[in-house]
Curated annotation (Swiss-Prot):
EC supergroup of this enzyme: lyase
GO BP terms in the entry: L-tryptophan biosynthetic process
Family: Belongs to the TrpC family.
Statement: the UniProt record of this protein carries the keyword Iron: no
Any one GO molecular function term: phosphoribosylanthranilate isomerase activity
UniProt xrefs under HAMAP family: IGPS_A, IGPS_B
Superkingdom of the organism of origin: Bacteria
Organism: Caldanaerobacter subterraneus subsp. tengcongensis (strain DSM 15242 / JCM 11007 / NBRC 100824 / MB4) (Thermoanaerobacter tengcongensis)
Protein name, per record: Indole-3-glycerol phosphate synthase
Keywords from the named record: Amino-acid biosynthesis, Aromatic amino acid biosynthesis, Decarboxylase, Lyase, Tryptophan biosynthesis
Length: 256
């Protein structure tokens, strides 16, 4: 299973990071502009989170000519509502250092997207300058509530990711207010956008629902919005578009 492989790699990676930069160093956070991730997704119209994603285990390299500065500026110009930055190194070719670079280039809230297995990574996310962090129920299970509490205590919003009914139940019991429905099964990496349709029926209306993966067209976004989705996260599709097409996509979703 790909997820198991990623988690095993993360365990070793975090162990090494703790040796290089102990907890106490992560607490020395420089003052950076803080974006309000939660409110950026709750403005009435469906919000768009543009993702910076160089590669994936299923597709390999997605964007050959990867220019972080150019992509961040494109998202800023296209007026997406928030930016997701994949920082996983081995399988997605990301870097933690992308976060502070992107923060310098945008006023949009920044989500750190990685595979969090240890509370160390939550403090690290804050240290890097992220405004929000992704927590995956399939990885954390009963650790979820404790990790959510830590994130909130240090001023980070949390996007809690689910794919199955059981995971959704765990997220709701933990009191999570931003629920990300991943249309991709992390065990097989197969994508089905109908996953959102299936799960959203069981989510209270006061929660902010984000649909992730497999979103390719403005029509997909409008369909998801009609189900009650408040925001969509788009990575691979945007990574294959130039600035003009991304702007056009966002404009069409907003009725322009």
């Amino acid at each position: 299973m790909i997820l198991e492989e990623i988690v095993n790699f993360k365990k070793e990676e975090v162990r090494k990071k703790k040796e290089l930069k102990p907890y106490n160093e992560l607490l020395n956070v420089n003052a950076v502009y803080r974006g309000d991730f939660k409110n950026s997704l709750n403005k009435g119209k469906v919000a768009i989170i543009g993702e910076i994603k160089r590669a994936s285990p299923s597709k390999g390299i997605i964007r050959e000519e990867f220019d972080l500065v150019e992509i961040a500026k494109t998202y800023e110009k296209a007026e997406v509502d928030a930016i997701s930055v994949l920082t996983e190194k081995r399988f997605f070719k990301g870097e933690g250092g992308y976060i502070p670079q992107v923060k310098k280039l945008t006023t949009k809230p920044v989500l750190r997207k990685d595979f969090v297995i240890d509370e160390y990574q939550i403090y690290e996310s804050k240290f890097l300058g992220a405004d929000a962090v992704l927590l995956i129920v399939a990885i954390l299970e009963d650790k979820l509530k404790g990790f959510c509490d830590i994130a909130k205590q240090i001023g980070l919003d949390v996007l809690v990711e689910v794919h199955e009914e059981e995971e959704l139940e765990t997220a709701l019991k933990a009191g999570c207010d931003i629920i990300g429905i991943n249309n991709r099964d992390l065990k097989t990496f197969k994508v089905d956008i109908k996953t959102t349709e299936r799960l959203i029926k069981n989510i209270p209306k006061d929660k902010i629902v984000v649909s992730e993966s497999g979103i390719k067209t403005p029509e997909d976004v409008l369909y998801l919005s009609s189900l009650g989705v408040k925001a969509v996260l788009i990575g691979e599709s945007f990574m294959k578009m130039d600035e003009g097409r991304i702007k056009e996509f966002v404009k069409k979703v907003r009725g322009g």
